[in-house]
A protein has these predicted regions:
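Start-transfer (signal-anchor) and selected internal transmembrane alpha helices
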Residues: 1-33
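Membrane-interface coil-to-helix junctions
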Residues: 27-122
């Protein structure tokens, strides 16, 4: 025995940290499947403010990271604004970097994955 714990004891210690995120994944996976949400269909969890604010900000964030726009002065928002405050209020998360791996047209589906990942992290 290394460190005084056998494999079963290590599993028992880790289970409270592993079970809640997996439970969220299973519950959300079932809900997404049942309602035809991406990745099981074409639906999205995006509604109201997420469609009007968060998704456009994620597309702007992708443009900033790919060099098509600037973080300090962005003319695609409100006729020209500094995006720093908005970044920290809305989209400051390591998960936001996942926008770099999808097309701008698919960001509306990415928010489904981001929602589940954030809920799993919170669990």
């Amino acid at each position: 025995m290394y460190g005084g714990l056998n494999k079963m004891d290590k599993l028992k210690k880790a289970l409270p940290f592993i079970f809640p995120p997996l439970a969220v994944l299973l519950i959300m996976g079932f809900a997404f499947y049942r309602h035809g949400l991406y990745p099981f269909g074409d639906g999205t969890v995006s509604w109201c403010d997420m469609s009007q604010q968060v998704i456009p900000l994620l597309t702007d964030f992708k443009d900033i990271f790919t060099g098509k726009d600037g973080m300090f002065l962005n003319f695609h928002n409100a006729g020209g604004m500094d995006l720093w405050g908005v970044f920290f209020f809305f989209i400051a998360s390591p998960y936001t970097l996942l926008v770099l791996f999808v097309d701008k047209a698919d960001i509306i589906y990415l928010v489904n994955i981001l929602t589940v990942l954030k809920m799993m992290t919170a669990a």
